[in-house]
């Protein structure tokens, strides 16, 4: 196994109006089916799928949230902690595209951590009824720093590719995170080395200072010894000279 390979779980939440095809996209991707009849999701549904991308393992935890307004207040429970938000609109209904913009503002207001946003124009099998131009959607995706994809859950177009691109982005982000952690560790290691070097230099300076103090003390001691010995010798010499003088004086007196 490649030591640089990644194994991760990623929470993915699908947001958007009711009947834009969120549940159909989830079922197409996870189970490979397109149900002929679907009822509106109540609250949220939960599906999982694990994929491998170039030796990296990703387990998608897919939350399909309800699009009805009466469940809007519960949405924060579903997108909290999500790594990816897929904002789905129906290309044949301009209103669903406008509603997506409200979801974007809500995400920005309630999510502090970085999240991958994907703007998904679904139902391209109904191209003849398109109301939202691809160019318009792409410009908005660039504005919010999101990926833009177009899909058809019915015809199984773009669905696999969307989750593949999401996976590649997740892997890239994880590698970047590891690289930042490595850089931080290197920075801390460098600071630690610098601190150790400073402590070592301080220790050397202290040793030199102690040696200088010892040398000074030794020199002072030598000077004191020299002074004491010189003073003692001078006293002895002075005493001898005095005795000699007295003796000479006495000799002169005796001879006289």
Swiss-Prot record:
**Under the GO molecular function aspect, what terms does this record hold?**
GTP binding; GTPase activity
Which family does the record claim for this protein? Belongs to the small GTPase superfamily. Rab family.
Which SUPFAM superfamilies does the annotation name? P-loop containing nucleoside triphosphate hydrolases
Stored Gene3D superfamilies = P-loop containing nucleotide triphosphate hydrolases (3.40.50.300)
Topology versus the membrane, per the UniProt entry?
A: Lipid-anchor
Show the ranges annotated as biased composition (Polar residues): 230-256
Presence of the UniProt keyword Lipid biosynthesis in the record: no
Task: Point out the gene that encodes the protein.
Answer: rabJ
**SMART domains from the UniProt entry:** RAB, RAN, RAS, RHO
Q: Report one GO cellular component.
A: endomembrane system
User: Main subcellular localization, coarse class?
Assistant: membrane
Keywords assigned: Cell membrane, GTP-binding, Lipoprotein, Membrane, Nucleotide-binding, Prenylation
| GO biological process per UniProt | endocytosis; intracellular protein transport
* Lipid-anchored residues (S-geranylgeranyl cysteine): 254-255
Chain positions of motif Effector region: 38-46
PROSITE patterns named in the record = RAB (PS51419)
Query: Which compartments is it annotated to reside in?
Result: Cell membrane
Q: Where does GTP bind?
A: 16-23, 64-68, 122-125
Q: Which InterPro entries match?
A: P-loop_NTPase, Small_GTP-bd, Small_GTPase
Tell me what this protein is called: Ras-related protein RabJ
Query: What domain of life is recorded for the organism?
Result: Eukaryota
According to the UniProt record, where is the region Disordered?
A: 229-256
């Amino acid at each position: 196994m490649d030591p640089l390979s990644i194994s991760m779980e990623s929470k993915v939440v699908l947001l958007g109006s009711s009947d834009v095809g969120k549940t159909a996209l989830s079922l197409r991707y996870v189970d490979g089916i397109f149900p002929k009849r679907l009822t509106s999701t109540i609250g949220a549904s939960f599906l999982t799928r694990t994929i491998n991308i170039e030796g990296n393992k990703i387990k998608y935890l897919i939350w399909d949230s309800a699009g009805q307004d009466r469940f809007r207040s519960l949405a924060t429970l579903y997108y909290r902690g999500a790594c990816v938000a897929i904002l789905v609109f129906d290309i044949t209904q301009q209103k669903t595209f406008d509603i997506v913009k409200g979801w974007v503002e809500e995400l920005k207001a309630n999510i502090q951590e970085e999240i991958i946003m994907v703007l998904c124009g679904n139902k391209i099998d109904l191209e003849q009824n398109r109301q939202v131009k691809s160019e318009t959607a792409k410009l908005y995706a660039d504005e919010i720093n999101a990926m833009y994809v177009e899909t058809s859950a019915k015809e199984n177009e773009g669905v696999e590719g969307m989750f593949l691109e999401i996976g590649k982005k997740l892997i890239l982000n994880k590698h970047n995170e590891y690289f930042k952690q490595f850089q931080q560790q290197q920075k801390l290691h460098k600071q630690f080395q610098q601190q150790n070097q400073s402590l070592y230099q301080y220790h050397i300076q202290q040793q030199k200072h102690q040696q200088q103090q010892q040398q000074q003390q030794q020199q002072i001691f030598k000077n004191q010894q020299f002074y004491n010995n010189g003073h003692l010798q001078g006293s002895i010499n002075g005493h001898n000279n005095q005795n000699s003088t007295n003796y000479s004086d006495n000799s002169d007196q005796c001879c006289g």
